[in-house]
Amino acid sequence: MGRIRNFDRDAVLESAVDVFWERGYDGAGMQEICRVTGLNPGSVYAAFGDKHGLFIEALKSYMTSMSRETIARLNSNPSGRAGIADYYAALIVAMLGGKRRWGCLVTNSIVEFAMNDPQISEAFQLHLARLETALSGAIER
């Protein structure tokens, strides 16, 4: 019988996002990941398979959250133009005043992986398609 997981998966993924965002995939070592998430290496491997598995789950979690926020912001106003303006205003505020000031995680990751990883490429394509659909809808309004 395996041990029961005793950690908040969402909190671990959010912490992992911060490490990967700040350092990039290659720059994020397991020691740093374990320190920030509070997990030991065995727990990371048991829960996510390996660093790559953790990265994919963290990236998907981030992109899902970001897509929801973006779509909600774009749809928050009956005027598509106002929704787009609200989205970009919030983006500027987040970039200038937020704790995460390392560029765009998705763009950084696309550059780092250069679309050579099929799992990550699929996640990027799904995320970008969601955003494109939301932005197109706002433009059409």
What is the role of each PLM region?
Residues 11, 15-53, 57:
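Helix-turn-helix
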Residues 82-86, 118-141:
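Amphipathic alpha-helical packing segments from all-alpha helical-bundle domains
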Residues 57, 71-101:
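Hydrophobic alpha-helical connector segments
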Residues 1-7:
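N-terminal intrinsically disordered/low-complexity leader segments
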Residues 60-66:
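Short, basic, alpha-helical segments at the C-terminal edge of helix-turn-helix-like DNA-binding modules
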Residues 83-84, 98-122:
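Amphipathic alpha-helical segments used for helix-helix packing
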